[in-house]
């Protein structure tokens, strides 16, 4: 699957409509970000069941601010609309592959229970 450009117009719908999303926060002036792009694109091609999206922090700073991204590149993994991992700083292909494997195996049971409890309180 191709990497999707995420912005304030499509971010929420993307998260709501896709059960597994990995977001790369980047900027065009950031050399480590630009170097990471082919790694991120290769991971997207190797994992077509996951939506991979990129947020340009210059064009969409409000998204980066909302998720408190203080350093780029940054990765955010979202499953079932819940952020399960955030990482800031450079990451190579082997580490990204391990992170994806971890996210696939992450047990969402406690997350679901937490949100069910929160909904019940409303």
Report each predicted region and the residues it spans.
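Substrate-binding pocket helix/loop in short-chain dehydrogenase/reductase
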Residues: 11
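Short active-site neighborhood of thiol/selenol oxidoreductases, capturing the structured segment around
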Residues: 16-28
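Short cysteine clusters
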Residues: 30-33
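CheY-like receiver
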Residues: 108-122
